[in-house]
Design a protein with these regions (language model features):
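Short alpha-helical DNA-recognition segment
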Residues: 18-39, 106
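Single-residue signature of alpha-solenoid repeat helices
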Residues: 101, 141, 181, 220-221, ...
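DNA major-groove recognition helix of helix-turn-helix/homeodomain DNA-binding modules
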Residues: 48-65, 412
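A short, Lys/Arg-rich alpha-helix, primarily the initiator
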Residues: 1-19
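Tandem amphipathic alpha-helical repeat scaffolds
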Residues: 83-96, 121-136, 160-177, 199-217, ...
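Amphipathic alpha-helical segments of tetratricopeptide repeats
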Residues: 106-113, 146-153, 186-196, 225-237, ...
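Short C-terminal boundary/hinge segments that cap the last helix of small helical domains
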Residues: 60-76
Length: 421
């Protein structure tokens, strides 16, 4: 099918679709998007034999009525479409245009499927999953990454499987499904056992971060942290070593070793490259401040928060802003301004976005309870600790939930879990 044939086919396709009263979305079903059908009807895309066969069955039309047949090979054209859209998607990714990256990677995946290129299909879907994660569509990113881990390309290549599982772990952690985050992180480490250091380190970081956030004892994550430390010298990128230092620092704070945590934070600050990922670099400042505050350390915190606040207001998402506001409220609380801290965190919870059901509310609820406690409102504090405990249980932060339940019963809190790495 040449360009002229594509236009003729598209016209006949549109006519057949309208005769049956179907929309473009309905015609595509769960296999092709409405935009892809639109491109076929306008002649901007060449229909592969597989597409022609699918559409003819959906519409009850013989391919011969369209002047074509499922026979014939247009795989090359579909392959070219996949390459083109994937290049555009990757460019959109670099420009932080997540919507375009998602749209073009989806089109690339459809073209790759039509051409029978399973590897390119996996690659396009992986770009889509990354773009959804960057756009803070964490649940959607997690679901797609889980599917990619079972893709035929992932079954052929352990590196592809490890990358998909790592992304599934990270996305599940971001969407507060910590049990799943740990499970996928463990599978990623297993899949990456013989992979290059950069792939294995990503899997290890996903696993230990999920374990720490879920409240697992430091001894359980120690073997994985040791492997991560041994991998760091084998990485050629300063930025990648900075990511490891960031992870090791957070683990040190969890283990009750703030001195080591500060050392790793200083190392990460030197190695992380803001040109590589500005949002990630800003989040490091925000979470570094949070870990210090959790250990009762205020030295350097105002400067860290100032840097984070300036940049995250421009490039951060709502999840980033919640983390930042929690740290700012914690600093106010430690500095003795409990009323200001309460006002700040209440504003987070009252906001329809930052206090919405898709957000992790447990940490904010816990901080609000601590504010009431500092203000001497004991009864309100106990009730709020109970609210926080129930939410933390739902999110899988079991150690923090136990602490909150203890406080609701008037017992002292044992640990602090107000940060996310």
């Amino acid at each position: 099918m040449d360009a002229g044939g594509a236009v003729q086919f598209g016209s006949l396709l549109r006519k057949a679709r309208k005769q049956r009263g179907l929309s473009q979305v309905e015609l595509g079903g769960d296999r092709y998007s409405g935009s892809y059908i639109s491109h076929l009807e306008s002649g901007r895309r060449l229909a592969s034999p597989e597409v022609i066969e699918f559409l003819s069955r959906r519409l009850g039309v013989s391919p011969l009525e369209w002047g074509t047949s499922p026979a014939g090979d247009t795989r090359s054209a579909a392959h070219d479409d996949a390459v083109e859209d994937l290049l555009v998607a990757e460019r959109a990714w670099s420009d932080r245009d997540w919507g375009s990256a998602i749209a073009h990677s989806k089109q690339a995946a459809e073209s790759a499927a039509a051409s029978g290129d399973s590897t390119r299909h996996w690659e396009a879907l992986y770009v889509m999953a990354q773009a959804r994660f960057a756009a803070a569509e964490y649940a959607a990113a997690a679901e797609l990454a889980e599917q990619l881990a079972e893709h035929q390309t992932a079954r052929r290549f352990s590196v592809a499987r490890a990358q998909a599982l790592s992304l599934a772990s990270i996305a599940n952690r971001a969407s507060d499904r910590l049990g799943w985050a740990i499970a996928f992180g463990a599978r990623a480490v297993e899949a990456a056992s013989a992979a290059p250091p950069i792939i294995l380190s990503e899997a290890l970081m996903a696993l230990v971060s999920a374990m720490s956030e879920a409240g697992h004892p430091p001894a359980e994550s120690r073997p994985f942290l040791d492997r991560l430390s041994q991998l760091a010298p084998r990485l050629t990128s300063d930025h990648s070593r900075g990511m490891i230092a960031w992870t090791l620092g957070a683990a040190a704070f969890v283990a009750g070793d703030p001195e080591a945590g500060l050392k790793y934070q200083a190392e990460a600050a030197k190695l992380l490259d803001q040109r590589r990922d500005l949002r990630l670099w800003l989040r490091f400042h925000s979470t570094a401040a949070s870990w210090r505050l959790g250990a009762g350390i205020t030295d350097g915190v105002p400067e860290l928060l100032q840097t984070a606040a300036f940049g995250l207001q421009m490039v951060g998402n709502s999840y980033d802003m919640v983390e930042l506001r929690q740290a700012e409220a914690k600093l106010a609380l430690i500095n003795g301004d409990a009323e200001r801290a309460r006002s700040m965190i209440q504003a987070v919870l009252d906001d329809p976005v930052t206090g919405g059901p898709e957000m992790a509310l447990g940490q904010s609820q816990l901080l609000l309870a601590q504010c009431y406690q500092a203000l001497g409102e004991a009864d309100q504090a106990r009730r709020q600790f109970a609210v926080a405990a129930m939410q933390l249980e739902v999110e899988g932060r079991l150690r923090a939930a136990v602490d909150a339940w203890r406080c609701s019963a008037g017992q002292p809190i044992l640990t602090e879990s107000l940060t996310r790495t």
